[in-house]
Regions:
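Gly/Thr-rich phosphate-binding beta-strand-loop-beta motif of the actin/hexokinase/Hsp70
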Residues: 56-82
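Nucleotide/phosphate-binding catalytic cleft detector across ATP-hydrolyzing
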Residues: 1-62, 143, 155, 159, ...
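Flexible loop/turn segments at secondary-structure boundaries
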Residues: 71-75, 82-84, 113-114, 191-193
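Glycine-rich phosphate-binding loop plus the immediately following alpha-helix
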Residues: 42, 88-149, 216-222, 231-232, ...
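Active-site proximal loops enriched in glycine and acidic residues that flank catalytic Cys/His/Asp
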Residues: 67-70, 77-79, 108, 152, ...
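A generic structural signal for short, solvent-exposed coil/turn residues
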Residues: 67, 96-98, 177
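A glycine- and small-aliphatic-rich helix-loop capping segment at beta-alpha/alpha-beta transitions
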Residues: 79-91, 200-207
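Extended hydrophobic-aromatic, low-complexity segments
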Residues: 77, 84-88, 161, 193-196
Length: 253
């Protein structure tokens, strides 16, 4: 991953991880017959969404994709950051990056999200997997909002201050999202509950903080057809233009 000092090359490692996943997923409970019904590569959902995000960024520019799922919240960013922050950076970052938060989900890990909200004195009842009543939907939205905002906060880097013999020095650590002018939401929670775009709006910077979040002017849209993960897999079998057309229509970009 580090061929030389300050040179970060994660693409080969990512390919090896995908190969290992494809080899071992067929040994997981309930997945032993997947090879009988799939005649192509088996991609993990986060990997497929990252492929889709990379291809779309090539068309529309720097972006963030937030995928709030039942078990995890995955945040993908395709950006080199802003020149201003790059001048302060003290560590290399890849052009495309994904973080997977295993404690932020709206189904498998929902109880833990409820516990974290309670610690912040924001009590909420655990909603059912498919909320139907107004109270259940509001509870699910609270969990989704917390997962999305917390996931992006964890994904983003921040400014820090070091004290040196020559005085205080400001540096940038971690991922710089300040050049991302597009935030896209995917996953069942954001795309099927009402108010997904409004939740994404709260992942943006409100100004004045040291966290390197997407700017307040970033456009927030949804993968309305919930197809980004599928499209990531489709790039291996169909022309890029055709798959990108599906993605752009779904997100309205």
């Amino acid at each position: 991953m580090y061929p030389s000092i300050d040179e970060l090359d994660i693409v080969p490692a990512r390919a090896v991880i995908h190969d290992a996943f494809e080899e071992h997923i067929t040994q997981a409970p309930g997945m032993e017959h997947i090879g009988e019904v799939v005649n192509g590569r088996i991609l993990p959902t986060p990997g497929a969404v990252l492929i889709a995000a990379e291809r779309l960024a090539g068309e529309v520019g720097d972006l963030v994709v937030v995928d709030v799922g039942g078990a995890t919240t995955d945040v993908h960013s395709i950006t080199d950051g802003s020149p201003e922050v790059a001048a302060l950076s003290i560590e290399p970052q890849p052009h495309s990056k994904r973080t997977v938060e295993g404690d932020l989900g709206t189904y498998v890990s929902a109880a833990h999200v409820v516990e974290m909200l309670a610690e912040q004195e924001r009590p909420v009842h655990l909603p059912p997997p498919l909320p139907t009543t107004r109270a259940e939907i509001e509870a699910a939205l609270t969990l989704t909002h917390f997962a999305a905002v917390t996931g992006v906060q964890r994904h983003a880097g921040q400014l820090a201050h070091l004290y040196t013999p020559t005085g205080r020095q400001t540096v940038a650590r971690g991922r710089d999202l300040t050049a991302c002018r597009l935030v896209i939401g995917t996953g069942g929670a954001l795309t099927r509950l009402p108010g997904g775009a409004a939740i994404l709006a709260d992942t943006r910077s409100k100004g004045g903080g040291e966290r390197l979040l997407p700017p307040a002017v970033a456009r927030c849209v949804l993968d309305r057809d919930y197809i980004f993960a599928c499209c990531g897999a489709l790039f291996a079998h169909f022309t890029a233009d055709a798959v990108l057309a599906l993605m752009r229509r779904s997100a309205g970009v």
